[in-house]
UniProtKB/Swiss-Prot annotation:
UniProt cross-references to InterPro entries, sorted A to Z: PA_dom_sf, PA_domain, Peptidase_A22B_SPP, Preselin/SPP
Protein name: Signal peptide peptidase-like 5
Signal peptide residues on this chain, from the entry's feature table: 1-29
Keyword Signal: yes
Record topological domains on the Cytoplasmic side: 208-243, 297-318, 366-374, 450-463, 511-536
Main location as per UniProt: membrane
Domain of life: Eukaryota
Length: 536
């Protein structure tokens, strides 16, 4: 016996709701706790290190500058290619015996402070100092409390242990090694964010109008896979409970935010590769379910007879052939993405699955009125702010940012967001938005669309166009805040909630309809509606 379609959709929605409890934000590379003293107040720069071995151009490494020393040029054409020499002693903690005149000094980390190494290399005539870290990460090189004044006039930067070992090996083999150091800047605005904005707004719009656009005719209603079926009672006509929907209650909204916070803390303390793998499997199941429902719905809208042929299978019983074929297709796509999820192009499949899952969730989970919407969105509003800005005071770092970065062992993160490559950024990376930043406002906007439709409101007197504008504006303000704050993590709901819920409340007050929005679906039907009198 197979599970009912709604049960499958409800399970997928539940998995998705746990995923959206984790809202991803950006992070920066500034250390605001490091002491600021004369000569030690630089911002950390990411550096491209191009190398040549015996005249042959090799792999380009990534490095990071120190909080002291001179800044590197951002333009490659202004950088100068210089030879590299190992320091003697290799740790650069005492006077150097090697000749470094107009050369880049290559040293190793340890035994003394970064500032001591920099001063020793500069005294030895080095044009720059490259430190080899003792691990595959780039640590921030800051000044110590005893460094009351520094006068380091050469660039100081750090490379990973694997990059440093490759350079050191070539030098020890008496090969000529040359480096070109420059620090290209990321653009203030990456135009790829426009596509992310369109994907987010488009997802909310499609999810809102989906039931209306794909509403089946009476003779083919049985083949509808995604659009919820209206019940015949009075509450259904008033936006109340429907057969295949899950109405979120006020208590449920509070419990969800508390559960999401608990889950976030568990991820923070127990983040591991197997934990991420389990959540990725949940994501794949939810995305596959959403893709299946969307495709079946679209096909049966165009060809109502396509879903009429059934096939009797063991354990499953009567199954639509169309549904089975689409399910197999979605399963193959899901497996292909899962196997290639760590490749550079995996973002496209992740976005497709994410959008399908969110559209599916917004058809199942619904807000009954503005009262519940206010409770849910206000809780999510403070939840987002707390875990981004206040949690560092308790956990020594932002829990939200730490979870968003994923596992340090594998570098893999939870696929809980839409992302698109930063096309104009020399450092690559991704523009991202968390599922919660789409689904939380999306729940409100979907309710508003139903309210407008059931009350015969148009563009001029409706709420839906205003909320779509508000959501788009909120996203714009989110990215504007991100760029103004130089990439510092921004809780998106800080902007999205006022631009959606705030607009709803203001319009409701102006139009004197706030009471109707607040109590929508809770009014008791009149006796005449329940027991209509017979006609005379």
């Amino acid at each position: 016996m197979s599970l009912p379609p709604f049960t499958c959709r409800l399970l997928a929605a539940a998995a998705a709701l746990y995923l959206i409890g984790l809202l991803c934000v950006g992070a920066d590379t500034k250390d605001v706790t490091a002491p600021k003293i004369p000569g030690c107040s630089n911002e950390f720069q990411m550096v491209k290190v191009e190398n040549w071995v015996n005249g042959e151009n090799g792999e380009t490494f990534t490095a990071m500058t120190a909080q002291f020393g001179t800044m590197l040029p951002s333009d490659k054409d202004k950088a100068v290619k210089l030879p590299v020499a190992l320091t003697t002693p290799l740790d650069s903690c005492s006077n150097l015996t090697s000749k470094l005149s107009w050369s880049i000094a290559l040293s190793v980390r340890g035994e003394c402070a970064f500032t001591v190494k920099a001063q020793v290399a500069q005294a030895g005539g080095a044009a720059a100092l490259v430190l080899i870290n003792d691990k595959e990460e780039l640590d921030e090189m800051v000044c110590g409390e005893k460094d009351t004044s520094l006068n380091v006039s050469i660039p100081i930067l750090m490379i990973t242990t694997s990059s440093g070992d490759a350079l050191k090996k070539s030098i020890m083999q008496n090969k000529k090694v040359e480096l070109l150091l420059y620090a290209p800047k990321s653009p203030i605005v990456d135009y790829a964010v426009v596509f992310l904005w369109l994907m987010s707004v488009g997802t909310v719009f499609v999810a809102s109008v989906w039931s209306h656009v794909t509403s089946p005719k009476k003779n083919d209603e049985q083949y509808d896979e995604l659009s919820p079926k209206k019940s015949s009672n009075v509450d259904a006509t008033k936006g109340g409970a429907e057969e295949e929907t899950l109405d979120i209650s006020a208590m449920g909204a509070v419990i969800f935010v508390i559960s999401a916070s608990t889950f976030l803390v568990l991820l923070f303390f127990f983040m591991s590769s197997w934990f991420i793998l389990i959540l990725t499997i949940f994501f794949v199941i939810g995305g596959m379910q959403g893709m299946h429902n969307i495709n079946v719905t679209l096909i049966t809208r165009r060809c109502s007879k396509c879903g009429q042929k059934n096939l009797k299978l063991p354990l499953l019983g009567n199954t639509s052939i169309l549904s089975l074929v689409v399910l197999l297709f979605c399963f193959v796509v899901a497996i292909l993405w899962f196997m290639n999820r760590k490749t550079s192009h995996a973002w496209a499949g992740q976005d497709i699955f994410g959008i399908c899952m969110m559209i599916n969730v917004l058809q199942v989970a619904r807000l009954p009125n503005i009262r519940v919407a206010t409770i849910l969105l206000c809780c999510a509003f403070f939840y987002d702010i707390f875990w981004v800005f206040i949690s560092p005071l308790i956990f020594k770092q932002s829990v939200m940012i730490a979870v968003a970065r994923g596992s340090k062992d594998t570098g893999e993160s939870i696929p809980m967001l839409l992302r698109i490559p930063r096309l104009s950024d020399p450092w690559g990376g991704y523009n991202m938005i968390g599922f919660g930043d789409i689904l939380f406002p999306g729940l409100l906007i979907c309710f508003i669309f139903r309210f407008d439709k059931e009350n015969n409101k148009g563009v001029s007197n409706g709420y839906f166009p205003w909320l779509m504008f508000g959501y788009g504006l909120g996203l714009f303000l989110t990215y504007l805040g991100l760029y103004v704050m130089n990439g510092h993590g921004q809780p998106a709901l800080l902007y999205l909630v006022p631009c959606t819920l705030g607009i709803t409340v203001i319009l409701g007050l102006v139009r004197k309809e706030l009471r109707d929005l607040w109590n929508y679906g809770t009014q008791q039907p009149s006796a005449a509606d329940v027991n209509p009198s017979p006609e005379a």
